[in-house]
């Protein structure tokens, strides 16, 4: 797109009448306009989730994980805020990470489970391990310890390890959670999974 046409679009639609005094990266501006028009979720986007007791929490979209059905990887921050609080995105991302999980961020927006809050390109480390078991599911009340675990990093090769080595005990559960299940985890700090196997 011609830069002069782009400037005219910005003037007409965004009220930027004196572009000489505004420093911006043209490609970034075009990307933001395009993704906004397409309702696309950008890496670094931060979302607000209303949780019980008149509190709210935040998570950040990290990237897609080709190793798990191209699911959206999010990192959920630990702190809960009062409904009247207005933290900056810098304050939010400096918080401790509660968990990483896979979900469908755009679907959660459409369902009204969370709302866009802001964006920061700092998405933290992607050197995060996930784990999943091949024998998911058991009868109510039955305690299953799996010896069929697979582990992987975001967009990395999946590695079958059998009995889960201790070094992967802290790996996050690698399932593609529905937006409703993700919202439950963010709200209550636990997964709503009755039949997921244990590792020991």
Kindly give the residue locations of the regions a language model identified.
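Compact, well-ordered interaction domains used in eukaryotic information-processing assemblies
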Residues: 62-67, 72-99, 105-109, 115
